[in-house]
Amino acid sequence: MLEGYRPPFDATPIHRLKAAGGQLVGKTTMDEFGFGSFSTNSAHGVPLNPFDPDRSCGGSSGGAGAAACLIPGHIALGVSTGGSISGPASFCGVIGLTPTYGRVSRYGLIDYGNSLDKVGLLSRSAASIAQHFGTIAGPDPKDPTSCAQPPLAGKGRMPSSLALPREAMENLDPAVRKAFQGALPVLRGMGVAVEEVSMPSLRFALPAYYVLATSEASTNLARYCGMRFGRREEELNQHFNDFFTGVRSEGFGDEAKRRILLGTFCRMVGFRSRYYLKSLAVRQ
């Protein structure tokens, strides 16, 4: 859909990095519009895991995770709507920071779910993450959802705590569970207060996320119609519905089509209260 497109301006995080002396090396591959968890829905091929080419880099920011692992001294930017930074960081053995919504401006970002998208960082170094987070974070008059609170980087270590939801541990792979539990004494030794809590509503998180994210995606991606945005090969001398259908059928990948259709279904008059409004209630 965006083949050959070159942005006419920099997104705010890129602008701030350049202003601080950073150099943009390139763009990394990812799932189309962020739709995926394994970077297999990319128009540019599937990125290979740095440790085992037969395994996944995660997604949707899989290329960013691989690049952060393979290129020492560099950072990579990623966008998380539902795990697209933490997933690749885990798969590629690097550190991923998914900031709180609003801490980093979304101006210039192609929206997936505009109430869920967060711009974050991946790197092999926690110090590098902290340094560059201080560069890209902060309020932006071009993004009304950005937070006015200044970044924490540079203020020294603050007392920290970790809440461990019991429900999140129920279906873990045994090896993952063992590694995670082995890290808890280390954290406690560093002064982190670890408290086990119960979050019964956690089991509704994934279905609620899918309904809300795809609903927002279906509206955000409506602009790619071949007239305002998007690649166009269809002739304009036809009925709008035929033109619109042709452009979107050819331009979007299979996963993008599935999520657009699901989001449109959830927002229809006959199903809005059953799915979309209930998901909003779960989120609140």
Language-model regions, residue ranges each:
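Enzymes and membrane/adaptor proteins characterized by extended Gly/Ser/Thr/Asp/Glu-rich
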Residues: 1-13
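Acyltransferase
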Residues: 10-12, 172-198, 229-231, 241, ...
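Short glycine/serine-rich loop segments
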Residues: 15-136
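Generic secondary-structure signature for well-ordered alpha-helical cores
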Residues: 22, 99-102, 121-127, 134-142, ...
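A short helix-breaking turn/cap at a secondary-structure junction
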Residues: 95-183, 239-246
